[in-house]
A protein has these predicted regions:
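An alpha-helical appendage that flanks or caps ligand/catalytic pockets
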Residues: 1-4, 43-145
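Hydrophobic faces of well-ordered beta-strands that scaffold small-molecule active sites
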Residues: 11-16, 31-36, 53-61, 154-157
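Structural motif
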Residues: 28-29, 149-151
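Active-site-adjacent beta->alpha loops and helix N-cap segments on the catalytic face
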Residues: 37-50, 162-167
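Loop-centered beta-sheet repeat module
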Residues: 5-43
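Alpha-helix-loop-beta-strand connector modules within alpha/beta enzyme cores
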Residues: 166-181
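Amphipathic, non-transmembrane alpha-helical secondary structure
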Residues: 20-24, 40-41, 68, 137-140, ...
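Active-site-proximal loop/turn and secondary-structure-junction residues that shape catalytic pockets
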Residues: 19, 39, 61-63, 160-162
Length: 181
């Protein structure tokens, strides 16, 4: 570009990091590889984290002060849908996408108040990333745990409304407070 941009203003380059080929391309380009995370407890239990500093994750967030309210909002926004489930199953049969198969396996763990990691939107072909659902504090804790295993870049699924973005902002503020030095 002419004139050259200051380095701080250069845009980041992101590449899908869900396959070995994508990871190799990201390394070669000096880009950040973006993947779909497992539940953070899996990284913590294994004792080995991915090269998270070189990776970003994509998630959705639905949170409220009260976890029950968050789950009500989540289920209303992403109701189970037989047509979506069939479309998802068909996509699984015809796709050679590694990330699609990985995410489908992750959906086998049910979400609960103990586990905010929720795959129903993906399993019903409504979006293509896991969601974290629960109280502001529980979801902020989960995000801070992802930071704890090394992730530094989080890309959010599109919020449903400006109000939803405000709720996500509360979670981000609380997560930042937990990981601040």
């Amino acid at each position: 570009m002419t004139p050259a941009l200051p380095p701080a203003l250069l845009p980041g380059v992101f590449v899908s990091g869900s396959s070995d080929a994508g990871l190799a391309a990201a390394r070669q380009l000096g880009a950040l590889a973006v993947s779909y995370p497992k539940p953070v407890a899996e990284y913590e239990a294994s004792g080995t984290a991915p090269d998270a500093a070189a990776l970003g994750i994509r998630i959705g967030i639905i949170a409220r002060e009260d976890a029950d309210e968050a789950w009500t909002v989540a289920r209303k926004r992403f109701p189970e849908d037989r047509t979506g489930q069939l479309t998802h199953q068909l996509a699984m049969k015809v796709s050679d996408s590694k990330w699609h198969k990985q995410l489908s396996r992750l959906g086998e763990t049910p979400a609960s108040s103990e586990q905010p990691y929720w795959m129903v939107p993906f399993e019903n072909y409504k979006t293509f990333c896991p969601y974290l659902v629960g109280s502001y504090d529980r979801v902020a804790d989960e995000i801070s745990r992802y930071v704890g295993v090394g992730y530094r870049t989080i890309i959010l699924d599109v919020p449903a409304s400006p109000e939803e973005l405000d709720h996500i902002g509360v979670v981000c503020e609380r997560a930042a407070a937990r990981v601040a030095p």
